[in-house]
Structure formats: structure tokens, C-alpha cells
Amino acid sequence: MTCRTRFAPSPTGYLHIGGARTALYCWLEARRRNGQFLLRIEDTDRERSTQAAIDAILHAMDWLGLDYDAPPVYQTQRIERYNQVAARLLAEGKAYYAYDSKDTLNAMREAALRTGEKPRYNGAAREANLPYRDDPNRVIRFKNPHTGTVAFDDLIKGRIQIANSELDDMVILRPDGYPTYNFAVVVDDWDMNITEVIRGDDHINNTPRQINLYHALGAPLPTFAHLPMILDEQGAKLSKRTGAADVMQYRDAGYLPHALINYLVRLGWSHGDQELFNRQALIDLFQINDVNSKAARLDMAKLGWVNQHYLKTDDPATLAPPLVWHLEQRGIDVSAGPAPTDVILALRERVQTLKEMAEKAEIWYCPLQRYDEIAVAKHLKPGADTALLHARTLLAALPTWTVDNVDTALRTTATTLEIGMGKVAQPLRVAITGTQVSPDIAYTVYLTGRNEALKRIDAALIKISTA
């Protein structure tokens, strides 16, 4: 049987980090087994579902590189199908109409709570065999078995079972003809021939109800795998403040999609002590039943380390487009400065994110805005002008502007003046960047460009003369 997995987000919000991990695990399981990965948009919550959220989910999936093997399935385009299946259950005596008012249902709930029982529908309409009538309270309820147990072997959690007496007759179709969650997903997974249902463990309590529906429909039962939660760094439930953000906010923060994928896969799965995987290695090695049953903790420092690894090792040509995007987000005209690939080579060892890289790269694309006064006091003081003037003369006279020629000019300055290279590099570093920290000084000057470098040296000389 061909493995078919699905990711089924609800477009009531954007794709968050937990959803992205679920999608990744579904994708990897299907790819390893040469199966199919499908996408379903569960958009039946008409009040909260938005097209903007749908677009954002699709965009995030594309950014992460999680391709799917058929056009997305939209639940709102399948309302007729849900009604057909509900009608079949009615005809077979496996479901029934109920017309209980909200007040009646609230009274049932309150009565159960007063006696310390679990709130549940009391089955008042189960045996009444009520006919269809036009009523705003009309729902269709599933006749859940009263006896026996529901048991299944979860690929992650192990054996799970529950007595049917713990379950009530759930609503499967609302008054407006829209399905409830538990009904829709069973019909969808059946029609989509899903073989493995991989989802968060917040759905475990839904699974016994869904299994009873599968049995009632005579549908083949998929295998279930319920993923543990992702907690924040303190072990609490994730919030937007602690990491449960829209996946695209990680892009905006400067993380690479393959770095995020590499990090996410390790939140619950491992292959020995190996930390870094390319995508093909993940496809070859990942197995859903190897996922840990315990909750994982988000570790932003580890994500930063993984991202930095790829910044250091990826081909600069592949990093250039996302760096350009980050520079443009800062209002920078990239054509006004050095090649992005050169910037990457200069900064890749010094930053963890592309956002940091873009911030540090501003010195090569924008006029120097300010000086670090501590750096000025330490390095732009009387006497420093000699080295700056000599370096300026040699830089201005270079036949071609290359990093090697710039380096030679600076070393020649130190040799000629019989001073250490630091006596040349540090005043020049402050003149060019406004600070006393930068990449290799020759590379820093080279990326600034001849005209702009000379202009900044002149400004530093004026600053020294007026100190």
C-alpha cells in the first residue's frame, strides 16, 4: 500500500512552529517511503478562517520547501460530500437528528458538573427516531457504541484504549449543514486514502471518536502517530512571545529555511548524536516511530548555531538572494554598494542570522552615520593622522581596486612608517566603520569602495585635527 500522509492546518491563523514541525514529519515519512504528501485546508470555521491566513500557510510551505503531491483540498468545497455521508449514517441507523436547545444542553452540562461527572450529551434523542424538521437547533449526532472499548497502537505513544462508555454521541453535522471537526477529518482522510495520520498529541482524545466513525462507515483505519508538544525554553507552553510565531517571522529574523528544517526535525527526533543533516539525509534516515514521546523544548541558541553553520558553509551565491531581501527590507539600494557575495564572505563568520549580516553590511551601502566615541578617543587621536595620510595616498594611487592591492597598501604603510600593523589598521577601521570592530581591515576597506573610503579617511583626518 502506498504511504499517504497529510498536513491539515486550519486557516484561523498563520503557520506556527509546531505546525511546521508536523508538516515536516508528514512530508519526511511520505518521501522516505516513496509515498505521497497531501495538503488539506480545514477552513470550515467561517468566522475565523481567512484567505490571508490560507495564503500565508501556502507561502510558508513553499518557503520551507515542503512540496505536496496534489492541489490542496479545501473542506468548504466538500460540504455536499459531508452531507451525503451523514445521510448514509442516518439511513443505516448509525446517526440521528437531535433538536436540543442551547438551554437544554447547558442544563445537561450543569447537572453533570454538580454531580462531579464529565459533561456529556445524555442521549435524550438517541432512541426517539425523530424525523427531519426545519429547526434552528437541528443537528445530526453519531450513535457512539455504549459498550466495549476503543483501542489503537499509536506509533509514538504506544497502546491507547478507552471505554466507549466514556464517549457521548457527538454532533457530526451542524444546523447550517457544516460538519464538525471529528466528522470532517474522518471523511476527508477516508476519501484521500490517508494511511498515516500524523498530528499533535492534543488530538489524542479525538482519536477514539474518529475510530468509531471509521468502523461505522466501513472505512479502512489509518495508522496514528501523535507528536509531543514543543515547549518554550522554560518548559512552558509556547506563546507568540516565546517562539510560537508565524514561521515567516523566522525568515524575517534572518533564519534560512533549511536551517529551520534541520532544527525542527531534531525537536523530537534524533539519529545518534548527529546534529546536522542535508535534506536527502533526512529523507533517508527519518522514521516516524523513532520520534520521542516526550515534549521537546525550543532552544533558540541551538537554532542560531545551526543557522550560523549554514551561513558559514553554503555557497555565497545561494545566500545572496535572501541577503539582498534583508538589505532591501532596511531600505538599502544594493546597487549602490559591493556585491552581496563579497559581503557574505566578509561577515559569515561573525553573525548567526542574515538579519544581523544585513545590519552590519549597512556600512558598505550607506553613508557613515556616527562614530563610537570611545573608539574615536582611543584611535583617532593626534599622531594617528600620519598613518591615515600615508595609507590614503597609497590607496588613492592604486592602479586597480582589489582586496590584495588594498592589503599591500596598508602593509606598505606600516613598513614605511616602521609601526605595527595595528597602528595602521585601528585608526583606519574607526575611520571607515565608526567602530573598532570589523572584519579584516583590507577587506573592509575594499568593500567600502575607493571613493567612499577616501572620503571617510578625509572625515577622520578632520576629526583628528579639530580634536
Swiss-Prot record:
Q: Which GO terms describe its molecular function?
A: ATP binding; glutamate-tRNA ligase activity; tRNA binding; zinc ion binding
The alphabetical list of record keywords is: Aminoacyl-tRNA synthetase, ATP-binding, Cytoplasm, Ligase, Nucleotide-binding, Protein biosynthesis
Name the GO terms of the biological process aspect: glutamyl-tRNA aminoacylation
What SUPFAM superfamilies does the annotation carry? An anticodon-binding domain of class I aminoacyl-tRNA synthetases, Nucleotidylyl transferase
Q: Which family does it belong to?
A: Belongs to the class-I aminoacyl-tRNA synthetase family. Glutamate--tRNA ligase type 1 subfamily.
Subunit-level organization? Monomer.
Protein name, entry field: Glutamate--tRNA ligase
Question: What taxonomic classification does the UniProt entry list for its organism?
Answer: Bacteria, Pseudomonadati, Pseudomonadota, Gammaproteobacteria, Lysobacterales
